Amino acid sequence: MSLFDHKISELKRLIHNKEISISDLVDESYKRIHEVDGKVQAFLQLDEEKARAYAKELDEALDTRDEHGLLFGMPIGIKDNIVTKDLRTTCASKILENFDPIYDATVVERLHEAEAVTIGKLNMDEFAMGSSTENSGFKKTKNPWNLETVPGGSSGGSAAAVAAGEVPFSLGSDTGGSIRQPASFCGVVGLKPTYGRVSRYGLVAFASSLDQIGPITRSVEDNAYLLQAISGVDKMDSTSANVDVPDYLSALTGDIKGLKIAVPKEYLGEGVSEEAKQSVLEALKVLESLGATWEEVSLPHSKYALATYYLLSSSEASANLARFDGIRYGYRTDNADNLIDLYKQTRSEGFGNEVKRRIMLGTFALSSGYYDAYYKKAQKVRTLIKKDFEDVFANYDVIIGPTTPTPAFKIGEKTSDPLTMYANDILTIPVNLAGVPGISVPCGFANGLPLGLQIIGKHFDESTVYRVAHAFEQATDHHKAKPEL
């Protein structure tokens, strides 16, 4: 049995009772990484020397002070688009291959305050653009459940590392499903918080109006611990919300009697596999047995979500990624005769194909003559999608459906057809456009591959999302399954 089979609350008890040390936890993490990461390929950088030194320091602090952080001694992996001082941050892109940040992201500072131990940086799709982690500029992460399948994306490294037992928890980012989709594919728990709940300061921007950092864990309880540690307003991020952060752990009561669930007919329609539908219907039976009720509803503008998302996110990306020009930091070409050539060659050589595709799409959508037809219209449709959610939430507590239309697909299966790859996020994207919170929890298997149940809540009501997810988790055994590597 791995130490990481214990929840945070149990690990903290073992540490305080001196049954294990923090150094033991960190040793367990690096031992497992050295055993299996050659197969899984989840990590891009390890911070072994510093992590071991910090673990010793915390072990000593156990005797010298009474107050300890919320995540005291807990090992964590961080997605490689979240900046970490003096620990290379590449966004899995050649253009940032040797970039060492000079500051920590706010979430990293908050992890330090909570006294978590950073193990290393995790692989991802380049600049978070992708659904399979095949767009990384450095390596392809594999799904621990079947090494021939993708772990999902863009936080594929974050989900795979947790599923493989390399770290007990990780941070990812979610722009159109990039936490929930890999969590579903890898059989772990992944939450996208409400937009503004967690500071984006130090998150390398893909689409600023959609990006949100969130936790990936083995259990709902651990997920609540992590969100507790990283949430709250931040003066360095004007989009972070000045809204009180509740005690998420107190929401895990197991009581969902009288809870009203909405199930959008669009989420169980065309393109959703029979296994995904059945796993959701089985999950609804479990929730009914616990006292909740459910009804079918409609989110009529969901069919426009994919097109809306790719216009808006690509437009924002084309602006955000303009800063990578080879002048101030990052890769710089040796093949330029003048400044214009320097920009052109640096970006052509430094960015991967998917990133270039989205920059071009976004630049086109924002260009004179097309702005009204594409970008402005997409913003209007986004408002309609947000209103659909508000209308449903006027009468229901949560919305439930599958996280993904299918389980994980084979590596290389969709790389030649971007549209089929994009369609994989069709059930997660509307949540980002509406800015509401959503979680994926394990709810079954298809052909030995995990399936995820998506639970969506009202703005800033992560507590109810956690309450439902925890009640379902406690009534089932799906989250206890582990891949064999």
Swiss-Prot record:
Keywords: ATP-binding, Ligase, Nucleotide-binding, Protein biosynthesis
GO molecular-function term, one example from the UniProt record: ATP binding
Enzyme Commission number(s) from the entry: 6.3.5.7
Active site: 79, 154, 178
Catalytic activity line of the entry: L-glutamyl-tRNA(Gln) + L-glutamine + ATP + H2O = L-glutaminyl-tRNA(Gln) + L-glutamate + ADP + phosphate + H(+)
One GO location term (cellular component): glutamyl-tRNA(Gln) amidotransferase complex
Top-level taxon of origin: Bacteria
Record GO biological process: translation
Family affiliation: Belongs to the amidase family. GatA subfamily.
Protein's job: Allows the formation of correctly charged Gln-tRNA(Gln) through the transamidation of misacylated Glu-tRNA(Gln) in organisms which lack glutaminyl-tRNA synthetase. The reaction takes place in the presence of glutamine and ATP through an activated gamma-phospho-Glu-tRNA(Gln).
Assembly: Heterotrimer of A, B and C subunits.
Listed name of the protein: Glutamyl-tRNA(Gln) amidotransferase subunit A
Classification lineage: Bacteria, Bacillati, Bacillota, Bacilli, Bacillales
The gene coding this protein: gatA
